[in-house]
From Swiss-Prot:
PANTHER family named among the record's database cross-references: GLUTAMATE--CYSTEINE LIGASE 2-RELATED
HAMAP family reported in the protein's UniProt record: Glu_cys_ligase_2
Pfam families noted in UniProt: GCS2
SUPFAM superfamilies for this protein: Glutamine synthetase/guanido kinase
Organism: Solibacter usitatus (strain Ellin6076)
Stated role: ATP-dependent carboxylate-amine ligase which exhibits weak glutamate--cysteine ligase activity.
Protein name from the UniProt record: Putative glutamate--cysteine ligase 2
UniProt family annotation: Belongs to the glutamate--cysteine ligase type 2 family. YbdK subfamily.
GO MF annotation terms: ATP binding; glutamate-cysteine ligase activity
Signal peptide positions on this chain: none
GO BP terms: modified amino acid biosynthetic process
Key words of the record: ATP-binding, Ligase, Nucleotide-binding
Length: 385
């Protein structure tokens, strides 16, 4: 019997993106502190701009958006304004899960008590966590419903990673992985695919145990690939690398929303979506990190390997009946473009293998981050220089 409430989730969308602040001459990461990007950004965008732990990371976030078109408009506006602001202060913004050659040892920590506490607790694990992600919040107001939907949605996390994989380089080396970001983050405690939870109370008991035994001081330090957000009434997808193009971010966010909408419909009809163990899903996560779209994943039901692109096509078919109601047909259709032209890692590697120059890869990342946001004269003239 389902424990879920009869209250339908709003399926609202919130998107958080993490950008790299780049020196336009060296193409290395550079602190945004002296340029006051965050402070100036807050004057333009209020709380939609935030610092992150490293001084070369800027985080932006939308408000609560009622549909994917609203989210797209807001992300476009934020990207345009923060890119202009960066250029006016002799910086560039690049989107990717890692920087191709930046050295984490050289990065300064943002002067904030929260980040100082994390570094003091996790030491080198925190200092080395020079990564950039995309987080997607989907509105699920009832907590019991959120836990049950999280249980089911875990299966789809590796497929989302394969689509978003955009971190093939680390400290100047070609890693052989499409997403090295997730391997860096794995060093943190309380990460990866969550276990199954039978109820919200079971999850609450877990959180309370960690707090009472001084493992954590709040539930935000549970950094799973998907989690019920401790302060917002949302399910938060956290597995994705930061994509380069706006259209990629929106396509992946739309797919996250459609997956939750479809899973809720299944439960609403008193049907069940089979739950798989964390250990099985972790096998697919490794394959997604290692091979991206070019590998095979396990179809657990058929107990066989299937090309990743084929399984993602099956997911698109799986959610197809909820897409018209969500109004996201055009946005989700972009998933097929990603599969045709490659994810961000594929395209970064293509540039590197053609040029042998990681600085050219950074140039490409900057171009793709700005793609479609401005008239051609903007990037050609280098507005704000």
């Amino acid at each position: 019997m389902s424990l879920m409430s009869s209250v339908r989730p709003s399926l609202s969308i919130g998107i958080e993106e993490e950008y790299q602040t780049v020196d336009p001459v060296t193409r290395d990461l550079r602190s945004h502190i002296h340029a006051e990007i965050v402070q100036k950004g807050k004057l333009l965008l209020a709380e939609r701009v935030k610092p992150e732990m490293h001084q070369s990371v800027v985080e932006i976030g939308t408000g609560v958006c009622q549909n994917i078109q609203e989210a797209k408009d807001e992300i476009r506006d934020i990207r345009q304004q923060i890119i202009r602001l960066a250029r006016q202060n002799d910086l560039r913004l690049a989107a990717g899960g890692t920087h191709p050659f930046a050295q984490w040892r050289e990065q300064e920590i943002y002067p904030d008590d929260r980040y100082r506490t994390i570094v003091e607790d996790l030491k080198m694990v925190a200092r080395a966590n020079l990564i950039f992600g995309l987080h997607v919040h989907i509105g699920v107001e009832d907590r019991e419903t959120a836990i049950q939907l999280m249980n089911s949605a875990r299966y789809f996390l590796p497929h989302l990673l394969a689509l978003s994989a955009n971190s093939p380089f680390w400290v100047g080396m070609e890693t052989g992985l499409r997403s090295y970001r997730c391997k860096v983050f794995d060093k943190f405690p309380r990460t990866n695919i969550p276990d199954l939870y039978q109820s919200w109370s079971e999850f609450e008991n877990y959180v309370n145990l960690l707090i009472h035994t001084n493992c954590i001081d709040n539930a935000k330090k549970i950094w799973w690939d998907i989690r019920p957000h401790p302060y917002f009434p949302t399910l938060e997808f956290r597995i994705c690398d930061m994509p380069m193009r706006l259209e990629e971010t929106i396509a992946i966010a739309a797919l996250c929303q459609a997956i939750i909408a479809k899973l809720y419909r299944i439960h609403e009809q008193n049907l069940t979506f089979r739950h798989y163990s964390r250990s099985l899903i972790m096998e697919n996560k490794w394959r997604a990190a290692r091979y991206g779209l070019d590998g095979k994943m396990i179809d657990f039901g058929k107990q066989t390997e299937v090309p990743a692109r084929q399984l993602i096509e099956e997911i698109l078919e799986f959610v197809s009946d909820v897409v018209p109601e969500l109004g996201s047909r055009e946005e989700i259709a972009y998933i097929r473009r990603i599969m045709e032209h490659g994810n961000g890692a594929d395209r970064q590697l293509r540039v590197f293998h053609e040029t042998g120059d990681l600085k050219k890869v950074v140039d490409y990342m900057i171009e793709e981050t700005e793609y479609g946001l401005f008239a051609p004269a903007f990037t050609a003239a280098g507005e704000g220089q």
